[in-house]
Amino acid sequence: MAKRRADEPEDSDIDVSSTDSENELEDEQQQGEEGEDIINVDFDYFDLNPDVDFHAIKNFLRQLFGDDATTFDVSSLADLILTKNSVGTTIKTEGMESDPFAILSVINMTENINKPCLKTVVDYVLQKTSKNLEFNLMLRKLLEAKDQKATSSSKSLKVGLIISERMINMPVEVVPPMYKMLLEEMTKAEDAHEKYEFDYFLVISKVYKLVSAKVQDAEAPQKSKKKKVATNEPVPVEMDYFHYEDMVLEENAKYFATYDYNEARQDTDSRRVFTDYGIDPKLSLILIDKNKLAESIPQMEEKFPPF
C-alpha cells in the first residue's frame, strides 16, 4: 500500500480505503432513502510531518498514557517520534497539512535510553511490572543492556517502543496496513541496521473494564469481546479492548499484562455515555519479538480485512 510523503504534491497517486463504483453509489443512495445515514470517508496514509504533526502527536501521547499522562514529557517524546529519518505513518482525510486521525511509529529505546523523557517511560514500565517477576526481569535485561560492553560473543538486544494511537471512532481495519508499512520502512531505512534492527518491541496500550453504574444496579453484564489478563490482582479480570489489534499482538507476545494507573483522574461513573456501565481504563503492556510481530501482521489482515 502506497502513502504520501511530505514532499509529494497533493495530486500524487495514493492508495485509499475505498473507491466507489456507480453500482455502489446506487446501493448507498437506496440505503440512504431507507433512513440510514451514510458518510463516505477516504483515509490517506502519510509519512510523519514534523511541520504539521507535532501538536497532534502530543495529544495522541496524552490519550495513550491515559490517567498517568502527566507523568511523561510528551513534548520531548513527540520530538523523538519526529526526528530526522524517522519511520511511521499518519492517517488523514484532508491532505498532508491536516491533523492526523491516527499514528503508528517506533522509538529506538536502546539508542535513546539516557534521554530523560524516555528514561521516565522505562522507570514507569519497570515499576508497573515489578510484581510480574519474569516480565520485569526480561525488561530489565533489555532496557539495561546499554551498560553492557558488546563483544564478539554477546551483543546488546535492541528494543523499539511502538507508539500506536488513533481517534476513538477510527476503525481497526486501518491498522494492519500501518503495521505492514512500518516494518517495510524499518527494513528499507538508510540507517536500518543501526537504528531500526530491533530484537523486541514494547507496546504501550490501553484496555478497560465495564463497571456497574453507581446510581443503579446492573441486572446483567453487557455482552462484548473480552479477554482474561494477568494483573497485580490474584484473580484475573475481564477486560475489553480500545485497540482490537492488541488481541493479535497478545496471542504472539512474549509477555503481556494490564495494570491500574497510578492516578485516577476521572470517576468511572462519569465516563458513562448512553450506557448503564461506566468505563474503568487500565494500562496494557505488551512485549513481542521481531519475528512474532512480523507474523502478527498477516493475522491482523485476516482478522480485520480492509473495507
Swiss-Prot record:
UniProt record similarity statement: Belongs to the BCP1 family.
Function: Involved in nuclear export, actin cytoskeleton organization and vesicular transport.
Organism classification: Eukaryota, Fungi, Dikarya, Ascomycota, Saccharomycotina
InterPro entries per UniProt: BCP1_family
Native organism: Debaryomyces hansenii (strain ATCC 36239 / CBS 767 / BCRC 21394 / JCM 1990 / NBRC 0083 / IGC 2968)
GO cellular-component term (any): cytoplasm
The protein's name: Protein BCP1
Locations listed in the record: Cytoplasm; Nucleus
Record flagged with keyword Cytoplasm: yes
Primary location group: cytoplasm
Gene giving rise to this polypeptide: BCP1
Record keywords: Cytoplasm, Nucleus, Protein transport, Transport
Domain of life: Eukaryota
Region feature (Disordered): 1-36
Gene Ontology annotations of biological process type: protein transport
Feature: compositional bias, Acidic residues: 21-36
